[in-house]
Amino acid sequence: MYYLKNTNFWMFGLFFFFYFFIMGAYFPFFPIWLHDINHISKSDTGIIFAAISLFSLLFQPLFGLLSDKLGLRKYLLWIITGMLVMFAPFFIFIFGPLLQYNILVGSIVGGIYLGFCFNAGAPAVEAFIEKVSRRSNFEFGRARMFGCVGWALCASIVGIMFTINNQFVFWLGSGCALILAVLLFFAKTDAPSSATVANAVGANHSAFSLKLALELFRQPKLWFLSLYVIGVSCTYDVFDQQFANFFTSFFATGEQGTRVFGYVTTMGELLNASIMFFAPLIINRIGGKNALLLAGTIMSVRIIGSSFATSALEVVILKTLHMFEVPFLLVGCFKYITSQFEVRFSATIYLVCFCFFKQLAMIFMSVLAGNMYESIGFQGAYLVLGLVALGFTLISVFTLSGPGPLSLLRRQVNEVA
């Protein structure tokens, strides 16, 4: 009953829904749009993704700084929303033509827009709503669940619309951005009675200075967290960048593969949403560290499994593993950050460790993976990436702070005894 009366839960849950609906129109089908619509090679696709990562590097630390400095003020979300209103005009009239004119110019312009709106924008949105969740007393994971549903529904719709007229997809995204603006206008995050609570969660602190930044970077546990992110999460994202092209290669035609990819993504994200609802309960019990290790194990299994896939059914099953990984990685990372660091720095740490360092590594790994796809094929490259992710997951058992799997096992044994 409490959640039914919590206005901010519904406002920001719906904000997640429409934001990730737009992101679902872009991210899963972006490689297909590049390859099938614009006829971009795998190597050039790697350059485009590297450019997106490069410009994300410029925005992510800035967004982390601003998010902690602004606290519960909505200025940054207004800018992101305004940019998303231009989603269709950008893809149709600017990005696509520029890629045909010059791949480097197109990559730079696309990198700026996509890096701002999604690669830096998505974690900034998540960090802001995580602050609101602590202030408004609702579980972040349950609000984030709406984003999974939005992504799922969009993937199914886009899978059909994309094969009819890909431009419809982009106009749908711009329309959803207008709904974001309405939700953001009516959302209230600055009620005077909550000022004390906001201060308690660090939302109203001016959180950044050179001295504070140096103090954060002197902590070994921040670097060990970054090691996990680069070795596991970054490797997985590189694997997932061109997975749509790998997936569609198992079908008789690209159109059939694209439609099935949309249906499978929808099914996976709906299951993802159901798991996201219960994830906070599980993660509160096992702890942030074990949640990250579990996510790393699932990611490694999916990547390595893809290297041995020989049929469409196998890649469908492997695709659905994504539904287990996202809740434990996303909710687990915030639980880990708020348990191991000062909560007033949560956005800065999230956007630096989980986003900035990841994008820095992806500049090099995207190009390397693109070259591997050309030289040894998708499956050979996936085996290499999977072993890398698995290796860093095992290392993180010893380097991440907090109770690990053995401590959890001992606690379970003691409870049974």
From Swiss-Prot:
Name of encoding gene: lacY
Residue numbers on the Periplasmic membrane side: 35-41, 101-104, 164-166, 250-253, 309-311, 375-377
Topological domain ranges for the Cytoplasmic compartment:
1-7, 71-74, 130-140, 187-220, 279-288, 335-346, 399-417
Catalytically driven reaction(s): lactose(in) + H(+)(in) = lactose(out) + H(+)(out); melibiose(in) + H(+)(in) = melibiose(out) + H(+)(out)
Q: Which organism is it from?
A: Escherichia coli (strain K12)
| Compartmental location | Cell inner membrane
Outcome of mutating residue 279 to S: No change in transport activity
Q: What exactly does this protein do?
A: Responsible for transport of beta-galactosides into the cell, with the concomitant import of a proton (symport system). Can transport lactose, melibiose, the synthetic disaccharide lactulose or the analog methyl-1-thio-beta,D-galactopyranoside (TMG), but not sucrose or fructose. The substrate specificity is directed toward the galactopyranosyl moiety of the substrate.
Superkingdom as given in the UniProt entry: Bacteria
Record-linked Pfam families: LacY_symp
Q: What is this protein called?
A: Lactose permease
